[in-house]
Amino acid sequence: MGSPFILLNYKTYNQGTGQGAVEIARACRAVSEESGIEIAVAPQLPDIYRVASEVELPIFSQHMDGVGAGSFTGHVFGKCIKEAGAVGTLINHSERRLTLAEIEASLKAAKEFGLRAVICTNNVPTTAAAAALEPDYVAIEPPELIGSGIPVSKADPEVVSGSVEAVAKINSGVKVLCGAGISKGEDLRAALDLGSQGVLLASGIVKAADPKAALEDLIRLV
């Protein structure tokens, strides 16, 4: 994945459900082609196959469990999401928190199935710990700022720069994404200036009246 990398999390917003998931993915694809910036989406689990079947762009799962084939009713199996069309997964989002053991198991399963892993964290120490596990990305998102419209890159820039420094010391191969409150061009520019390689965002684009226009605004200062 190139830098900057934009990962759009649909969460369970109505606008990103069903056919809406496809339409937002099409907007992401169009902006990505126009700009050369890689944009990936994380739709709800049942929509992964729908989006993958209609739009060519990287798709991430919002969650996966560290389980294999067998008696794991209700769990998210890595092989299933990969065959549905996903190329990666979020792990430990603040709205879907896991224990350390579960994070390790999910990451191990992601690697087993060749899925790119984004471990979400909430402060510098947890970011450092996550980097030691060697995911592809860590995404720093203070939970109090998620969905607030107040970007972490402005509200708490030290947590971003501190996370970037901590990860560089532990494993320079792990990339850092900045999340929470990201929605405008100034937010992405600030995140990149603080050393992150991209952003993880959601409502600012998914709930926008015109997601394509919102994405174009997001990347205008890159």
Swiss-Prot record:
Subcellular location: Cytoplasm
One of the record's GO cellular component terms: cytosol
InterPro entries tied to this protein: Aldolase_TIM, TIM_sf, Triosephosphate_isomerase, Triosephosphate_isomerase_arc
Biological or metabolic pathway of the protein: Carbohydrate biosynthesis; gluconeogenesis; Carbohydrate degradation; glycolysis; D-glyceraldehyde 3-phosphate from glycerone phosphate: step 1/1
Keywords: Cytoplasm, Gluconeogenesis, Glycolysis, Isomerase
GO terms (BP aspect): gluconeogenesis; glyceraldehyde-3-phosphate biosynthetic process; glycerol catabolic process; glycolytic process
Chain residues that bind substrate: 9-11, 146, 181, 202-203
Gene3D superfamilies noted in UniProt: Aldolase class I
CDD domains: TIM
Catalytic-site annotation from UniProt: 93 (electrophile), 141 (proton acceptor)
Chief localization: cytoplasm
GO MF: triose-phosphate isomerase activity
EC number: 5.3.1.1
Domain of life from the UniProt record: Archaea
Catalysis: reaction(s): D-glyceraldehyde 3-phosphate = dihydroxyacetone phosphate
Pfam families membership: TIM
Family statement drawn from the similarity comment of this UniProt entry: Belongs to the triosephosphate isomerase family.
Quaternary organization: Homotetramer; dimer of dimers.
Function description: Involved in the gluconeogenesis. Catalyzes stereospecifically the conversion of dihydroxyacetone phosphate (DHAP) to D-glyceraldehyde-3-phosphate (G3P).
Protein name: Triosephosphate isomerase
Species lineage: Archaea, Methanobacteriati, Methanobacteriota, Stenosarchaea group, Methanomicrobia
Chain's gene name: tpiA
